[in-house]
Design a protein with these regions (language model features):
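N-terminal secretory signal peptides that target proteins for export/translocation
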Residues: 1-5
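Bacterial N-terminal signal peptides
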Residues: 8-19
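Hydrophobic small-molecule pocket/channel-lining residues, especially in calycin-type beta-barrels
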Residues: 24-185
Length: 185
């Protein structure tokens, strides 16, 4: 009887000590992912400015835009939230014209940046992203014959300059969106 009790006590003690070892060994973030995400730290902060959309040629609509970019999970992801509002003509009312949330990360296995975005209408996109000539670009298909791509560059003044383009054939692109934002903090 005493032997069985002693064995139970020893087993319990070993289980507790093993659990403490697991707790003490916190998982470490991937250095490769952290290094890749450091290249995007220039986006972190609060940004405000103006932008325009022109989905139908000749029908451009301008509005104030704000973007908030936060580093999360110890630098492993960026959380990007954008909001644009425009005054309703003839009133003091505002209507939301841009309301988006994105999660930007680096996929170490595939060696690509990924952007998962959500907009207030419920639509989501999963896009691969990459660095281009002085900018950062992501693109996605919105159907069999419609593609979108966005490019963000930091200007010499330190402004966030972004363009959005659309294509029906993947070779000819038409700019439908542009915004210039100043960093507040």
């Amino acid at each position: 009887m005493f032997g069985k009790t002693l064995i139970r006590i020893l087993v319990c003690m070993l289980a507790v000590m093993a659990g403490q070892n697991l707790i003490a060994q916190e998982p470490r973030p991937s250095p490769v992912q952290l290094e890749a995400m450091k290249k995007l730290q220039f986006l972190v902060g609060e940004w405000k400015g103006e932008g325009w959309n022109e989905m139908v040629p000749g029908q451009r609509r301008t509005s104030p835009i704000a973007e908030s970019v936060q580093s999360k999970l110890g630098g492993m992801v960026l959380l990007v939230e954008g909001l644009g509002k425009r005054k309703v003509p003839g009133t003091q009312d505002e209507v939301v014209v841009h309301n988006a949330l994105g999660i930007l990360s680096y996929d170490e296995r595939a060696k690509v940046y990924r952007l998962r975005s959500h907009i207030a209408t419920g639509q989501t996109t999963d896009a691969e992203a990459k660095f281009t000539d002085g900018g950062f670009q992501w693109a996605f298909k919105a159907g069999p014959s419609l593609s979108f791509r966005y490019t963000v560059k930091l200007t010499d003044k330190g402004e966030w300059f972004e363009i959005g383009e659309m294509s029906q054939d993947g070779t000819e692109w038409r700019k439908f969106h542009e915004m210039t934002l100043q960093k507040l903090k």
